[in-house]
C-alpha cells in the first residue's frame, strides 16, 4: 500500500444495546435495562483499521445527524490521530440501531432507524479530499439513495465506485444480509466496479443465486 491510505464510506451508525428479560410476544411488554452506547456501521471498521496500524491514513465519508448521537460518533473517531473526518457531513438525524439482548439466551434482535443516512449520495463525496489507495463502500442494500438505479451505471453506488476507480483507487464493498431479491438489482451493478468484495454465505447465495445450504446443512455440491 502507498502512503495515501484507505477511505471508508457509507453508513455511520450509533448502536444502543439493551439487556431485556425476554423478547415479548406481540402486544406484550418487557423490561429494557443497562443501555450501553457503541459506534456501529462503518465506524467499527474505521476504528479497527486505525488501531491496526496508526501510520495508515484513514479517511471517512458519510453522514451523521446534527445531534447527540452524531457528536458521539465524531468524538469517537477523533480519538485516533490517523483518522481524517473532513469528509463527514452533518445533516438531520443520526442513524441508530437499537439492539435488544435477551438476558438468558443472549439472542439479539435489532431495530434500525436510518435517520438521514439514507440520503448519503455521490454529491456529498469529495473525491479530491478523500483520495486514497483503497476506497471501501458499505453497506450495499442499506445505503438508501446510493442503492437507487442509475441510468448509466446501474446504481448510484456503482457510479461512486466507478468514480473512485477513475481517481486510481482500488475499490472494495461490503453488504448486509437481507431477505428478498434485491441482491441482483443492487449488488450486481456495483461488482463491475469492485476490486474486492466481502460476503458471507447468505449474501453469496443472494448474489449468485446458488444455494449454499438448506435445512439439512451445507450443500457440498455447490461449494
What does each of the following model-derived ranges do?
Residues 1-63, 68-78:
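Glycine-rich phosphate/adenosyl-contacting loop at the front of the ribokinase-like
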Residues 1-14, 71-89, 96, 101-223:
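Ribokinase/PfkB-type carbohydrate-kinase core domain
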Residues 43, 67, 92, 201-202:
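Alpha-helix N-cap/helix-start capping motif
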Residues 63-66, 91, 176:
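Short beta->alpha junction loops/turns
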